[in-house]
Amino acid sequence: MKAQIFVVVLGLAALSVLCYGSEADESALHEEIFQLLAASDEVPKPQERDCVRFWGKCSQTSDCCPHLACKSKWPRNICVWDGSVGK
């Protein structure tokens, strides 16, 4: 009888140690995920373009990229294709 109780207590102790180790690994995983998310916030911001792309807001044709022209469309002026082709 004493041997059975000893085996049960020993089994519970082993289970407790295994659960604690698993919990420590999970905590480390949470920390690693948090660090990755923090690093993703440091992504560089897109740089401002030197020309306005298709459907972009413009004030004159020189603002638009090649083959685009600034046209007055409601509710604002936008860059649209000027009909030209080529490089």
From Swiss-Prot:
Propeptide: 25-49
Pfam families (UniProt xref): Toxin_12
Signal sequence, renumbered to the chain: 1-24
Modified residues (Valine amide): 85
GO MF annotations, alphabetized: calcium channel inhibitor activity; potassium channel inhibitor activity; sodium channel regulator activity; toxin activity
Keywords, in A-Z order: Amidation, Calcium channel impairing toxin, Disulfide bond, Ion channel impairing toxin, Knottin, Neurotoxin, Potassium channel impairing toxin, Secreted, Signal, Toxin, Voltage-gated calcium channel impairing toxin, Voltage-gated potassium channel impairing toxin, Voltage-gated sodium channel impairing toxin
Tissues expressed in: Expressed by the venom gland.
Protein location: Secreted
Record InterPro entries: Huwentoxin-1 (IPR011696)
Main localization, broad class: secreted
Disulfide bonds: 51-65, 58-70, 64-79
GO CC field: extracellular region
Residues spanning the membrane: none
Similarity annotation: Belongs to the neurotoxin 10 (Hwtx-1) family. 07 (GrTx) subfamily.
Domain notes: The presence of a 'disulfide through disulfide knot' structurally defines this protein as a knottin.
Function description: Inhibits P/Q- (Cav2.1/CACNA1A) and N-type (Cav2.2/CACNA1B) voltage-gated calcium channel by modifying voltage-dependent gating. It selectively and reversibly blocks the calcium channels coupled to glutamate release. Also inhibits potassium channels (Kv2.1/KCNB1) with lower affinity. Has also been shown to weakly inhibit Kv11.1/KCNH2/ERG1, Kv1.2/KCNA2, Kv1.3/KCNA3, Nav1.5/SCN5A, Nav1.7/SCN9A and TRPV1.
Annotated protein name in UniProt: Omega-theraphotoxin-Gr1a
Annotated source species: Grammostola rosea
Record lineage: Eukaryota, Metazoa, Ecdysozoa, Arthropoda, Chelicerata
